[in-house]
C-alpha cells in the first residue's frame, strides 16, 4: 500500500504517478489489470511507474478536493516531490485538482481524455451510472452512451456492459468518485496549476468534448494541446501515438 492506497509498480527510474479510476477501490484484476499494465508498459523503460487507486470506503459527499488531498499526502510521504504524473479520464480530473491545490508536488503533467469539467453527455451518463448503483442495479450499461452515438451500437453495448457487471460487485465507491466528478469544475482555478502540462485529446471524445479540452489548456500557463483527429474518448489513450507523444514530453530536458 502507498500511504494506505492500493498500487501497482513497474519499471526503473524516477517516479511517474498514475492516478487510476476503476469501479473497485483495489488493484485491477484480470483483463482490467492487463489493459492497465499494457497502457503504462512503454513508460516503464524510463520511469518507475506507480499506478495508484483510491482508498476503499469513501464517505458520501467526498469531493475532488478530498481525493486530491489523499493523493497529495501519499506523494509527500513517499517521494521526493515534485513528481511527474500521467492521468487519463477521471484520473485526469483528480490530477488537475491535485496540481491546482498542491502545485509544488507536480513537475510535469500528461493528461489524456480529460478536461477541467465533464461535458453534457459524460455528465448525463455518469449520473445514470450513479443512480443505477444506488438502486442496486448493474450500473455499467449507463456508460454505453459515451462510447458510441449510434442507437443500435448503444443498445448492443448496453447488453455487453450488463453482462460484464457480475452483479456481485459493490459499486458504492465508484458512485462516490463519479459523484465527486459531477461537482468538479476547475475552470476558475486553472491558472493555479504550475506543472508543465500536456493534454492529449481525441476530437470525437463524448465525455470531455474538445472545446472543454481547449479551455483547459488555455487556462493553464504554457500548457500544450495535441489533438488526435477521429479519436474517441478511449481511442485517445489507446492510439499508437499516445505513448511516444507522452514520453517525448516527459523526457524532454
For each predicted feature, which ranges?
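Flexible "cap/lid" loop of the alpha/beta hydrolase fold
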Residues: 96, 100, 108-136, 173
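Conserved alpha/beta-hydrolase catalytic His-Asp/Glu region
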Residues: 120-122, 139-184, 189
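Gly/Ala-rich beta-loop-alpha elbow adjacent to hydrolase catalytic centers
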Residues: 87-91, 95
